[in-house]
Amino acid sequence: PSYTFVSTADAFVLRGATCVFVDIRPDTMNIDETKIEEAITEKTKAIVPVHYAGVSCAMDEIMAIAKKYNLKVVEDAAQGVNAFYKGKALGTIGDFGCYSFHETKNYSMGEGGAILFQDDRYLEPAEILREKGTNRSQYFRGQIDKYTWVGYGSSYLPSDMNAAYLWAQLEEADKINDKRLSIWNFYHEELKELEDKGVLERPYIPEYATHNAHMYYIKVKDLRVRTKLLAYLKERGILSVFHYVPLHSATAGKKFGRFHGEDVYTTKESERLCRLPMYYSLSLEEAAEVVKALKEFPEYETIEDR
């Protein structure tokens, strides 16, 4: 999808690949699985589903397409730690899965992430890539008597302090998840009234998805209304922000990628979306202030094509 963070594309562009973007689903903001097959050519190597807001893409359909065309599936599960598709952890369904532990994520070490893969053959090259192109990991395990430069790589190692900070959160993962879900559910229940009035839309969670309350967003009629709403919330001391600018509209996106088919929803939906405050230390009282402000916003317009 074009509606994602630039890192999704960078990983491929840095290796000389061309990114082919397809449209998203307006309900989940995830890649539209029905648009994938028509974008595949003899040059296609992989399908990259992005689990937006920790809500799973339709992975059965995506995996079936990948199998049909002998393609790899690389899950961008940056926002998907402790979220699931039909009971299976996001990032563990495709050939590869990528997690992020950036400061904005549910479990954070400031920067950094993790890669998961199904095939053990990728373990050694992944370690070499992480260890500056050396076989240092094997040396530390006592498998070799000295380490040396064996391939290309860079320095992707977190410090012990970063790792310890993350580990402590992972030990409390259920507690963190429960707290975030309580905030998410509070927003969802309290904002139903405005959705029923037709002035905003709440997130949609498919039956197959178990989300992790990574974010709570609303969608208003259009960019004009959103701009007014964000300014209004800022005046009330509430930080609400939009999210991605679609990659295919960016200078580099036009240079290194292309959009296949018609952009029916990607740009339109991205211009409607506002993210509400969502973090572990947010109290329900503070969330109630956000809801109160949203209910008092005077310039909503009816969403006519809901």
Residue ranges and their predicted role:
Residues 75-109, 138-139, 145-150:
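Conserved active-site segment immediately N-terminal to the catalytic lysine
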Residues 1-77, 84:
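PLP-dependent aminotransferase-like
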Residues 21, 73-75, 99, 117, ...:
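Hydrophobic residues in well-ordered beta-strands that form the structural core
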Residues 34, 38, 46-50, 55, ...:
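PLP-dependent aminotransferase class I/II
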Residues 27-28, 81, 106, 248-249:
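Positions that flank functional sites
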Residues 5, 29, 54-55, 103-109, ...:
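Nucleotide-sugar-dependent glycosyltransferase donor-binding/catalytic pocket residues
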Residues 3-4, 17, 24, 78-79, ...:
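Histidine-centered beta-alpha loop that forms part of the nucleotide-sugar donor binding/catalytic region
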Residues 92-136, 160:
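Active-site PLP attachment segment
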